[in-house]
């Protein structure tokens, strides 16, 4: 059983090495300029692809359609309140060499399993996994509906099937670098299209006014739309699933390997400090990208759909959302919206499936079914997951055929998981990191306030959604 006492503060390098997180011979000094830092960024690109597909195009625009501009404050808070957790959980992972599931398995409160003891958050993660698959089915279904806008003769279920095949082919190699390259194209495409759409809207009758923006900061909360608002909170910005998957992308980008095993030396501290700066830059880029994607979709939903009475629901959700473009730019823009929606939703599907494959071998290891030194088995599981799970998404979509409902279910579960993650991050930092590697006072205080806020939000989700 793992020790979790304060004496562990200098033990972050004393576990048996995990060659997944720290391959041999990759210790490297950090870059010393902004331009040299750029080539070491990348996890933000993958996580941004995951973020915008679910919360932004479906839930954020839907919330704007329902309430207008009055909950702009809520959307911004949902975007920005979780980045501190993203940064601080990643801090622990890259310094310790733990994977995400290895980290949460260090929390006190052990449960006896068939192969030994494990911590209670492991069970919560497993319980959240199925709703996450449901959300993935909603994303690929939404991508199929986007294709159907310009090719209405194509049956959506058949399009989902084709996308499942393409996803399996793309992810069959399990390569991080291949995934990063694919996501970069998608992220650049949908970010440019989304920002352009908002700019074009300003030349129409739906142009956003200063008064409308001001109404978004009256801090009004429309309780009749609480379920949708809380779902948007759960999935807008980095949600709990994306926060955890971000740590795996940091591992595969090589941050823990370049920092190296903790030895208490000044050289290690200098490397760790430098690579943490790279990590923070990557987190800031994530927040910038998701803000550029979120606000335009909320404004389009509030300015166009709310004013015209359109409501994106059920199997016609993506078609209703396309009204944001066609009403402001003309019928030709249906192709523009379809391309943007497809890039957003399908990139989220690919990134979500790729992330899911990283959890499975870790679960097997933490539950005692697989040795941690079997990096070869880990890689094979990741590949097979990428080949099989896209067809699970196809099956789930065939059963629901309602992207908004499917994503709302997953988003509600994601919101409930946030206080668990923030509480665990506070615990792990305070008990297992050297004092000189802890966050500053401001960041530490903000993380604790975030934990309390996430706790309140989780209670509201349980009250409005579950009960």
What spans do the regions from the language model cover?
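Membrane-interface "cap" regions at the ends of multi-pass membrane proteins
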Residues: 1-58, 116-119, 255, 259-260, ...
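Flexible loop linkers connecting adjacent transmembrane helices
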Residues: 20, 60-62, 87-116, 145-148, ...
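Extracellular loop-to-transmembrane helix junctions
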Residues: 35, 62-91, 101-105, 119-121
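Helix-loop-helix module between adjacent transmembrane segments
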Residues: 48, 82-90, 113-175, 234-238, ...
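Extracellular/periplasmic helix-exit of transmembrane alpha-helices
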Residues: 84-95, 250-251, 257-258, 288-319
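Membrane-water interface regions at transmembrane-helix termini and the short interhelical loops
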Residues: 141-150, 163-186, 197-201, 396-403, ...
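Loop-to-transmembrane helix boundary motifs in multi-pass membrane proteins
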Residues: 153-162, 332, 364-398
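Hydrophobic alpha-helical segments and their helix-loop junctions in multi-pass secondary transporters
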Residues: 188-248, 421-434, 458-465
């Amino acid at each position: 059983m793992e020790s979790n006492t304060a004496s562990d503060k200098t033990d972050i390098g004393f576990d048996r090495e995990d060659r997944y997180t720290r391959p041999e011979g990759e210790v490297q000094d950090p870059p010393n300029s902004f331009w040299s830092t750029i080539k070491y960024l990348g996890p933000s690109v993958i996580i941004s692809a995951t973020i915008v597909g679910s919360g932004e195009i479906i839930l954020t625009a839907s919330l704007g359609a329902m309430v207008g501009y009055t909950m702009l404050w809520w959307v911004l808070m949902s975007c920005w309140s979780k980045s501190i957790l993203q940064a601080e959980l990643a801090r622990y992972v890259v310094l310790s060499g733990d994977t995400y599931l290895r980290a949460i398995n260090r929390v006190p409160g052990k449960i006896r399993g068939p192969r030994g003891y494990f911590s209670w958050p492991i069970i919560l993660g497993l319980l959240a996994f199925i709703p996450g698959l449901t959300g993935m089915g909603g994303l690929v279904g939404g991508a199929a509906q986007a294709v159907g806008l310009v090719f209405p003769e194509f049956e959506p279920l058949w399009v989902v099937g084709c996308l499942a095949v393409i996803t399996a082919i793309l992810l069959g190699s399990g390569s991080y670098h291949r995934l990063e390259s694919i996501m970069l194209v998608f992220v650049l495409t949908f970010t440019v299209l989304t920002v352009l759409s908002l700019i074009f809207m300003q030349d129409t009758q739906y142009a956003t006014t200063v008064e409308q923006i001001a109404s978004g900061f009256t801090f009004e909360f429309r309780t009749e739309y609480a379920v949708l608002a809380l779902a948007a909170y759960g999935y807008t910005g980095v949600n709990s699933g994306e926060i955890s998957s971000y740590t795996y992308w940091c591992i595969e980008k090589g941050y823990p390997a370049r920092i190296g095993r903790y030895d208490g030396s000044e050289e290690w501290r200098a490397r760790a400090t430098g690579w943490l700066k790279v990590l923070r830059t990557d987190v800031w880029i994530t927040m910038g990208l998701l803000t550029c994607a979120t606000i335009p979709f909320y404004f389009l939903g509030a300015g166009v759909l709310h004013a015209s009475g359109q409501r994106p629901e059920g199997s016609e959700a993506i078609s209703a959302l396309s009204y944001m473009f066609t009403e402001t730019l003309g019928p030709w823009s249906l192709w523009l919206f379809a391309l943007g929606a497809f890039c957003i939703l399908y990139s989220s599907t690919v990134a979500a499936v790729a992330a899911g494959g990283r959890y499975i071998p870790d679960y097997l290891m933490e539950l005692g079914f697989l040795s941690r030194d079997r990096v070869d088995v880990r890689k094979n599981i990741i590949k097979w997951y990428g080949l099989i799970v896209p067809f699970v998404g196809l099956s789930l979509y065939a059963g629901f055929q309602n992207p908004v409902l499917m994503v709302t279910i997953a988003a509600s579960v994601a919101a409930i998981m946030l206080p668990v993650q923030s509480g665990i991050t506070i615990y792990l930092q305070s008990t297992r990191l050297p004092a000189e590697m802890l966050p500053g006072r401001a960041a530490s205080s903000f993380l604790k306030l975030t934990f309390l806020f996430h706790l309140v939000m989780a209670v509201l989700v349980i009250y409005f959604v579950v009960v």
